[in-house]
Design a protein with these regions (language model features):
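C-terminal alpha-helical cap of glycosyltransferases
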Residues: 164-176
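Membrane-proximal helix-turn-helix segments that form the acceptor-binding/catalytic region
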Residues: 116-135
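Short N-terminal targeting/anchoring amphipathic segment
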Residues: 63-87, 98-100
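N-terminal subdomain of nucleotide-sugar transferases
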Residues: 1-50
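Alpha-helix capping/helix-boundary segments
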Residues: 82-83, 141-143
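Helix-loop-beta element that forms the nucleotide-linked donor phosphate-binding surface
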Residues: 143-162
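Active-site proximal beta-strand in glycosyltransferases
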Residues: 75-77, 92-111
Length: 176
């Protein structure tokens, strides 16, 4: 039996976004996803359970499952708030999937963290960001902080979470 796709049922290649389920509506990643949708991009959001940006076993398991189910070569937007729970999964899939991080701030620099907690978070963020094909940031300060973690300058792209930023992100994804 052959199933034929009718022209009206054809869909464009979908983007995938992995982000915390409880991410506020005004968060950079969520606003960028909405800007992409408004620009006509097909989007599937994979929401991770648990608190963020804390490391959470349920979010780690959900991240492992979500990434394993994605098709080879899929463009995947990773919200920076989810990087702690994705860090263990990323090395297994960084050659198979096209990861782009949406980072509004680095969490390792949170002043409420102890020195040990900050060091752990810095290592997790640095390792995760090193596996990204590109890192999208909303401002120059965040771009400088990401570059300070060793991410190559040509991989860090400043883009507002609006129509212009969505167009810039779509151009980045098309070039990957």
């Amino acid at each position: 039996m052959t199933i034929e796709t009718l022209p009206s049922q054809e869909t464009r290649a979908s983007l995938h976004a992995v982000m915390p389920a409880e991410l506020p509506a005004d968060a950079y990643g969520r606003r960028m996803v909405e800007a992409l949708r408004a620009a006509g991009a097909g989007m599937t959001v994979h929401a991770l359970p648990g608190p963020y940006p804390q490391v959470d076993p349920s979010a780690i398991l959900a991240a492992d499952i979500a990434l394993a189910r994605l098709p080879d070569g899929a463009p995947v937007l990773l919200d920076g708030n989810a990087l702690f729970n994705l860090a263990a999964s990323l090395p297994a899939d960084d050659r198979r999937l096209r990861f782009v991080a949406l980072v509004d701030r680095l969490h390792w620099a949170d002043p409420d963290l102890t020195a040990d907690e900050a060091a752990v978070r810095r290592n997790l963020e640095q390792g995760a960001l090193s596996l990204m094909r590109r890192v999208m940031v909303p401002d120059d300060g965040t771009a400088a902080a990401v570059r300070a973690l060793g991410v190559q300058p040509d991989r860090v792209i400043r883009a507002a979470a609006d129509g212009g930023g969505a167009a810039a992100l779509m151009a980045v994804l098309a070039a990957l």
